[in-house]
Amino acid sequence: MEREGELRLVAMKLWAYVVFFVNAVYVLGPLPAASQNAFYRTSESDIAGPVGSLIREEPRSGAAAGAIAHKVLYRSTKPDGTPIAVSGIVIVPAGQAPAGGWPIVAWAHPTTGVVPRCAPSLAIFLFQQMAGSRRLLEGGYAIAATDYPGLGTPGPHPYLVGESEARAVIDSVRAARSFPGLENSNRFAVWGHSQGGQASLFTGMIAKTYAPELQLVGVAAAAPATDLATLMTDDLNTMGGRNLTAMTIWSWSRVYGASMEEVVAPAAISTVNALAEQCIEGAFDIYVREKMSAPLEKTFLSVKNPATVEPYRTLLERNAAGVLPAEIPVFLAQGLKDELVRPAVTQAYMQRLCKAGSTVKMLDLSNVSHGFAGYDSADAAVDWIAGRFAGRAAPNDC
């Protein structure tokens, strides 16, 4: 097992403290999350400038393998072209960069929340959350890790809005090229889990047109959110599914103006709003969310299935992952015990890619649930990514 299995130990320790902390949580309230500071605030003049250019950066300690980490604020765009600022992390390997610069791997993170204070760059366990990061850095790859729009920077966060995520991912790679040893690095791979799997696939879909100066060598995704309508429908009767549906509806009501009141029962609105304010960093956060979302088991939606109701039906289709240009190889990993992103949905997406002419490596993970799909596939993903940078023929399971 690769060293990112550290997060398993972190999660186990956090879970062991649940009994100790649970009374304090309900007497005193949840422990306060990190808050944004002036680093994340921008003016109109700050945002003006080329996409992917740096607004500011500051050092961040704690990266593995002697690497140098920077918290960054960079310029990007909304899907409609509106300029925005996005935050994230850039990690540069230790040592002298090779000729041509360090190759770059963009890390696309899984769900952390939908409000600004849920940005991974604010997280305590930031580096442990990046599946495969130690091996990537030891192997001589720089990492560009976006927070996504509206996390860190002012919200709302466009949760599961694929093109928004992808633009932020690509512009994080552009921002990384501002650092020594990366100026001439135009090749990158993207690797993500869950929400980040969706971001990775959308990155593959738009990279050629959005960033023609960059060369995307491969797309790797673990338990990606692909067919959003099917995933929402499959998960409505599970605790995790209700949580993610609530987050999606809350976010899209603000991003798209899709009425929350038309699909959520009046008695559930306060619970949905409360869940939106909670971040997900570790096992304890999941425990708190489970307790907070308990009322939704009795009263949640005012419609049978939001996926069949406009505008949600159209929005879910718009943000479903499509096929990629056939020349971009794809790595997919899927936990067979995943009850949030069902294996059949990922398998169906693989078949779509195959029919479109893509080269796809599919890794099935026995006895692996959703939360660990990224960590348990990270070694295989890093090896696969290394092969793409080395120019070796991509394995094909189609």
Spans of model-derived segments:
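Primarily recognizes the serine-hydrolase "nucleophile elbow" in alpha/beta-hydrolase
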Residues: 174-242
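C-terminal catalytic histidine-bearing segment of alpha/beta-hydrolase fold enzymes
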Residues: 304, 308, 313-314, 331, ...
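Short beta-strand/loop motif that positions the catalytic acidic residue
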Residues: 332-338
